[in-house]
């Protein structure tokens, strides 16, 4: 959702992004992360290949953010996520807020116990999904009764 939102923010009434891979370049530059070296054959190694660096930079959502009006967004992170580290969504949200030329909600929700798949437990995942649905429905609601 990061790249799609960056390219055409006006198309989205609200966005929910689950543990989004939005800081692609910095992740692919960090060989200490468990998945980075095994991803190089597919993505290219930006540490050794300037063309790979430039290509990844050209589409990395974090690197392609520019000032503008963004839709309301709820973005999640899992503190124990080994695939998309929690700081990726956090950096992205911080930059979105800094560049936003609007007052739309841009929310970061970090689950302090979750990994990449979100909450575990009998009802926790449904609770999180209901929260996101409520966020989206609230922001898509229209009519004179809607107050911003």
Question: What is the predicted role of each segment?
Answer:
Residues 1-148:
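Active-site-proximal cap/loop segments of hydrolase catalytic domains
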């Amino acid at each position: 959702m990061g790249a799609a939102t960056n390219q055409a923010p006006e198309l989205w009434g609200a966005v929910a992004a689950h543990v989004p891979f939005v800081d692609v370049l910095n992740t692919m530059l960090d060989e200490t992360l468990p998945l980075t070296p095994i991803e190089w054959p597919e993505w290219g190694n930006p540490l050794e290949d300037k063309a790979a660096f430039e290509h990844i930079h050209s589409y990395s959502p974090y690197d392609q953010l520019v000032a503008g009006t963004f839709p309301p967004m709820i973005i999640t992170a899992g503190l124990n996520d080994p695939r998309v580290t929690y700081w990726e969504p956090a950096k992205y949200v911080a930059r979105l807020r800094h560049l936003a030329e609007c007052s739309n909600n841009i929310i970061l929700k970090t689950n302090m116990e979750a990994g990449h798949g979100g909450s575990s437990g009998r009802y926790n995942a449904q609770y999180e999904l209901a929260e996101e649905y409520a966020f989206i429905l609230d922001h898509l609601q229209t009519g004179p009764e809607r107050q911003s």
